[in-house]
């Protein structure tokens, strides 16, 4: 039996340039949670390094919450609340780079779905509404324009920390209806009447600002 690869798939093994960086191939390990994160960083680092060793061209963290108001305890993820989180994230980057892969980080704030059981902060979102992911009587607070400016500042600071840790890529995440950008995008959770609500252009405004500032 021949072990020769079907030439139709050769492109998957070719380098690809993404902005200023080049991945060694087209195999991208998407962000996924694994129950390790900040609670078991050594295991998380070893697992991500193993993926790079196995041939993945880009290895990405699970979602990484970047501010105490986005605390999703009791779920275990990575976090980048302050400089104290940099050492274990930088060690993950080193483990990935050791095998020639790019390291990515997915920055996430769960907004109105943040229970904040550890941080004890008040969750934030486009409008006042109950937190839906937890069996606790928690109410999210509507973000003022000042809150939105703060949120953008927190995100920029997290991007700079990610850069300091050595990450090659940042995922500005707005998926699965569980993040601040996705809450602003949805008519169901965003019924604001200012420049961040109403039309699709307005509901996209925060996401565009985050991308441009990243």
Please place each PLM-identified region on the residue numbering.
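Active-site mouth loops of central-metabolism enzymes
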Residues: 30-43, 75-81, 112-116, 136-157, ...
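Catalytic domains of carbohydrate-active enzymes, especially glycoside hydrolases
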Residues: 45-67, 164-170
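Hydrophobic faces of well-ordered beta-strands that scaffold small-molecule active sites
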Residues: 27-30, 59-61, 103-107, 170-172
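Non-globular sequence segments
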Residues: 94, 102, 108-167
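Alpha-helix-loop-beta-strand connector modules within alpha/beta enzyme cores
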Residues: 76-104, 186-214
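Conserved, mostly hydrophobic/aromatic
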Residues: 29, 51, 55, 96, ...
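N-terminal amphipathic alpha-helix/helix-capping segment at the start of soluble metabolic enzymes
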Residues: 2-28, 96
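Aromatic- and acidic-residue-enriched carbohydrate-binding clefts of CAZyme catalytic domains
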Residues: 66-74, 79-80, 116-143, 181-204
